[in-house]
Amino acid sequence: SLERTRVVTQPDDGKGGDGYHRLARHFRKALTEAFADARTARVIVLEEDLEVAPDFFGFFAAVAPVVDGDASMLAASAWNDNGQRRHVDVAKDIARVERSDFFGGLGWMLARRVWEELGPKWPDAYWDDWLREPEQRRNRHVVRPVVCRTFHVKSTRGTSGGQYSHFLSDIVLSQSASTVFDVDDVRSSAAADARLFAQLEAAPRVDLGEVLAGSARGTVRVEYDGSFAAYAALARRLGAMDNEKAGVPRGAYRGVVELRRGPVIVLLSPPLGRVRRAR
């Protein structure tokens, strides 16, 4: 509901004149003001250069109980870094929701309990990278849709200088007016782990060459040694982002990244024993 709308003005009087410092000051001010109202249980953050899907608010309404009720949750995000049209099947993935160890941002929701922890130590710059650091994340997860509920309309501009414009411009934005989201497998970390381990154990291990040649079928597992360099080499061959923050590949959960290659679901995975030990 937008019945209570208030404009917050922040005089730009802080130290540091570049975009990263200004953004951090802006977010601190806006979140502080929003949570100053005792009735605010959670806040959705939406930047001005994002287009939202028709079911954007429906997604956050669906995952709000998970964000509120599970201490293993850091935030919810409307964004999937691997949500390019070549990596998702909209018809099959439209209602799917996953946990991730990676904070994607670009339309996200934060609960009061997390803000009360992070607000007093909010950084002067690079707030998103700071939030991804182990000291802040503390092994907590982000819940996000497989099909993005936001689209970056200025992918060649902004503080990143268009660094990822090729990936951002190919993102698929949901056009669904109303979606019944499947949140059963993300209600707890135990449920998410059970789904992941069952999926990994059932998937045959194949070489990426088989996937690229079109001979793989169904859901397959392509293993890497757990290092980011090994992951990045596979990601590049699949046309995925070969990028990490604080040691976590974009979109990963326990080191596993799921992508589609045509009709095939590809699980880029460390050795199974390492996945089970990951925290």
Q: For the regions a protein language model found, what residue spans apply to each?
A:
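Active-site-proximal specificity loops/subdomain of glycosyltransferases
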Residues: S1-A41
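Loop/turn elements at helix/coil->beta-strand transitions in domains of secreted/extracellular proteins
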Residues: E3-T5, T40, A71-L74, R138-R140
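Short, solvent-exposed loop/turn segments at secondary-structure junctions
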Residues: D13-G14, L50-E51, D81-Q84, G105, ...
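Short beta-strand-to-loop acidic/aromatic patch adjacent to the donor-nucleotide binding site
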Residues: R39-E51
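A structural signal for short, well-ordered beta-strand segments and their strand-loop junctions
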Residues: V45, A75-S77, M109, V142-V146
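Conserved catalytic core of nucleotide-sugar-dependent glycosyltransferases
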Residues: A53-D129
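C-terminal catalytic/acceptor-binding lobe
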Residues: K121-R279
